[in-house]
Amino acid sequence: MSDRDLFAGLLAPRSFPGWVELLLPRIEARFQEGRHGDWPAWMQLLGELPKVVPTRLDFAQNAVRIEGDTDCDGATRRSIETALRRLHPWRKGPYDIHGIFIDAEWRSDLKWRRLEGAIAPLAGRRVLDVGCGNGYHAWRMLGAGAKSVIGIDPTLLSVVQFLAVRHFAGDWPVAVLPLGIEDFPAETRAFDTVFSMGVLYHRRSPFDHLVELKGCLRPGGELVLETLVVEGEAGRVLVPEGRYAQMRNVWFVPSPPTLSSWLTRAGFRQARLIDVSPTTTQEQRSTGWMRFQSLADFLDPEDPSRTIEGHPAPRRAIFLAEAP
């Protein structure tokens, strides 16, 4: 299957009317800039995954669960696990695929638990998830009743992990595409809810990012924004001169009052804080499915309230806001 056919199939008109014409040229332009060197091997891996008919699917529990009654004996299960482990590292999860538990670096279900009761109900809504990783939250959005979910993330391995999960889940109105927000059409005003989680602090211009998100929302649509914050009054912003928790590309970490004012200045209405939580080593950690260093390695061993660079340890805030 060609790359074009692969992504055109994800954007099937019955689920995403009009989006093939808008997004496919942008995906093709992205691939013209160069593919990841492992892309052919990943496509071969996807093509060789066993075909197991799902009989039970649950996108509303902590682990996105896909099960089947037949066609998944021990040998098949071992084959599936071997293939999925070749897609290491798994950053977001957990997943339970035919009894194979993918214990990803992030307990992404904990973040979902913090926001699910506060956001506008997703039933019947068209959703965009910016910086979606491998699509764990996109499946949870579908489980919460979303009509359709488009996730975008420029990391090709994350897209391949989504495609592997989708292979076993079947055809659902959810797609993860290899695009960044800067590649997405401006001012579509097409979505009822837009999520941006773990993206804002990676942007050199946070205001540009907020304006891009606003342009994706219909009037009255809801933004769900999750990002790193520091404690402090309005006006306080941490601008790391070097790394932050070993991340090179952290540009701005505002206080919650500062972020609220940014949302208002960017044109959003009714900005409100719904949660602030420290990131713990129970939520982000190394596992058998993500064997590299993780949060525990990035904190000061003598004072875990600081990063190894001396900055305040990660705290994350969730804001809701309404598009005008």
Curated annotation (Swiss-Prot):
Q: Which UniProt keywords apply?
A: Transferase, tRNA processing
Residues that bind carboxy-S-adenosyl-L-methionine? 92, 106, 111, 131, 153-155, 181-182, 197, 201, 316
- A Pfam family of the record is Methyltransf_9
Q: Does the keyword tRNA processing apply?
A: yes
Name of the top EC class for this enzyme: transferase
The reaction(s) catalysed by this protein are: carboxy-S-adenosyl-L-methionine + 5-hydroxyuridine(34) in tRNA = 5-carboxymethoxyuridine(34) in tRNA + S-adenosyl-L-homocysteine + H(+)
Any one GO molecular-function label of the UniProt entry:
methyltransferase activity
A single GO BP: tRNA wobble uridine modification
What EC number(s) has UniProt assigned to this enzyme? 2.5.1.-
> What does it do?
Catalyzes carboxymethyl transfer from carboxy-S-adenosyl-L-methionine (Cx-SAM) to 5-hydroxyuridine (ho5U) to form 5-carboxymethoxyuridine (cmo5U) at position 34 in tRNAs.
How does this polypeptide assemble, per the annotation?
Homotetramer.
Which HAMAP family does the entry mention?
Answer: tRNA_carboxymethyltr_CmoB
What family does this chain come from, according to its entry? Belongs to the class I-like SAM-binding methyltransferase superfamily. CmoB family.
Q: What is this protein called?
A: tRNA U34 carboxymethyltransferase
Q: What is the lineage of its organism?
A: Bacteria, Pseudomonadati, Pseudomonadota, Gammaproteobacteria, Methylococcales
Gene this protein is translated from: cmoB
